[in-house]
From Swiss-Prot:
Binding-site residues for sn-glycerol 3-phosphate, renumbered to this chain: 65, 89, 144, 270, 307, 346, 397
Signal peptide: 1-23
Family: Belongs to the bacterial solute-binding protein 1 family.
Principal cellular location given in the protein's record: periplasm
Name listed for the protein in its UniProt record: sn-glycerol-3-phosphate-binding periplasmic protein UgpB
Subunit structure: The complex is composed of two ATP-binding proteins (UgpC), two transmembrane proteins (UgpA and UgpE) and a solute-binding protein (UgpB).
NCBIfam families according to UniProt: PRK10974.1 (NF008211)
Role of this protein: Part of the ABC transporter complex UgpBAEC involved in sn-glycerol-3-phosphate (G3P) import. Binds G3P.
Pfam families attached to this UniProt entry: SBP_bac_8 (PF13416)
GO terms (BP aspect): transmembrane transport
Organism: Salmonella typhimurium (strain LT2 / SGSC1412 / ATCC 700720)
Location(s) in or outside the cell: Periplasm
Transmembrane segments: none
Keyword Chloroplast included in the entry's annotation: no
Length: 438
């Protein structure tokens, strides 16, 4: 009987110790990467998990950027937030003002892991840095700039030089007419119209998007993208639209699919769209810089980043935060950051990742792969071309989409639409300013 008891006790202790040995800290990571990008996120997580058996990063696709941000905030309010939330760049002010985050530099400090914030490319890191402390609040992950993708085969058919994409918007308008005359149904389409046609158009041409240096200097900023230069640009696109040379295909990244399917000869889209274009395009394509306005003195200036960063959510235990810190450290290692850059088309987020990519000969073997980086570093940023930090910016983008759509459908003139977008957007800015002071 005693022997049986000892055996049972020994078995129980053995199972208990086995359970402790097998205890794994699960770390949910909500993101918006789909297609080839999602596969690469899964690959990074799997490799981290294999090297760190005490932790399990669980990537979960939660829809597009807006949907993921909304889901993350809603989950935080009910106590069910993920440990890591990917948030697009225009959600930065919203996340900073929320009580939902644990600053990334604190996560590393508490975990006892050395975190060199200077390793990140300054233009990228500046977007996510707290002006008061000078520390990173979130970790840059998939940063991008808009680039021009063009169908070299279609260029040849239209009698255009396949190695010379249009450099200015005026040239692009001429090219689209020739491409359409040569039989292309769609000469040009644009993804993310607010980000590319107003936010980046403004920065690339050395124009402010909003006062207070685009909101970096205070929450009392007002929108300023209804000035003559921006109105003229939207008018050019509307003129192309009436001729059938510019096709509006959606608010997000729909134009990328239209491009790699061969429907559209050119598109401006995120540099991060390269992964899907590389996978699905069945023709020769090239990558060029964003066009600039030939009539604006000093253009082009510098591009501002899009994409997203990784935010750490409040309310987790110490072991979870230690695992998060290890995973973020893993992502920033030169070999991993360089691979992410090379496979996706997103910018190298660290200087070491850029240098490693260059040393590996990647840019020599893949002409155009460094376009996004060169645009970002084209000229030292002006105070109002280093990015945007405006409250309620996701909602302002929706307003911009609505008003631009009223231009493409002929309901409003470019001036009317941009004036209305500025007025409606400023109401949201005042609401955010009031809430941030309460």
């Amino acid at each position: 009987m005693i022997s049986l008891r000892h055996t049972a006790l020994g078995l129980a202790l053995s199972l208990a110790f086995t359970g402790q040995a097998l205890a794994v800290t699960t770390i949910p990571f909500w993101h918006s990467m789909e297609g080839e990008l999602g596969k690469e996120v899964d690959s990074l997580a799997q490799r981290f998990n294999q090297a760190n058996p005490d932790y399990k990063i669980v990537p979960v696709y939660k829809g597009n950027y807006e949907q993921n941000l909304s889901a993350g905030i809603a989950a935080f309010r009910t106590g069910n937030a993920p440990a890591i939330l990917q948030v697009y760049e225009v959600g930065t002010a919203t996340m900073m003002a929320s009580k939902a985050i644990k600053p990334v530099y604190e996560v590393f400090k508490d975990a006892g892991i050395n975190f060199d914030e200077s390793q990140f490319v300054p233009t990228v890191a500046g977007y996510y840095t707290d002006a008061k402390s000078g520390h990173l609040l979130s970790q840059p992950f998939n940063s991008s700039t808009p680039v021009l993708y063009y169908n070299k085969d279609a260029f040849k058919k239209a009698g255009l030089d396949p190695e010379q994409p249009p450099k200015t918007w005026q040239e692009l308008a001429d090219y689209t007419a020739k491409l359409r005359a040569a039989g292309m149904k769609c000469g040009y389409a644009s993804g993310w119209q607010g980000w590319i046609q107003l936010e980046n158009f403004s920065a690339w041409n050395g124009l402010p998007f909003a006062s207070k240096n685009n909101g970096f200097d205070g929450t009392d900023a007002v929108l300023e993208f209804n000035k003559p230069e921006q109105v003229k640009h939207i008018a050019l696109l509307e003129e192309m639209n009436k001729k059938g040379d510019f096709s509006y295909v959606g608010r997000k990244d729909e134009s990328t699919e239209k491009f790699y399917n061969g429907d559209c000869a050119m598109t401006t889209a995120s540099s991060g769209s390269l992964a899907n274009i590389r996978q699905y395009a069945k023709f020769n394509y090239g990558v060029g810089m964003m066009p600039y306005d030939a009539d604006i003195k000093g253009a082009p200036q510098n591009a501002i980043i899009g994409g997203a960063s990784l935010w750490v959510m409040q309310g987790k235990d110490k072991e979870t935060y230690t695992g998060v810190a290890k995973f973020l450290d893993f992502l920033a290692k030169p070999e991993n950051a360089a691979e992410w850059h090379q496979k996706t088309g997103y910018l190298p987020i660290t200087t070491a990742a850029y240098e490693l990519t260059r040393e590996q000969g990647y840019y020599d073997k893949n002409p155009g792969a460094d376009i996004a980086t060169r645009q970002m570093l084209n000229k030292p940023p002006l105070p109002f071309t280093k990015g945007l930090r405006l409250g309620n910016m996701p909602q302002i983008r929706t307003i911009v989409d609505e008003e631009l759509e009223s231009v493409w459908t002929g309901k409003k003139t470019p001036q009317q639409a941009l004036d209305t977008a500025v007025d409606r957007g400023n109401q949201l800015l005042r609401r955010f300013e009031k809430a941030s002071k309460s």
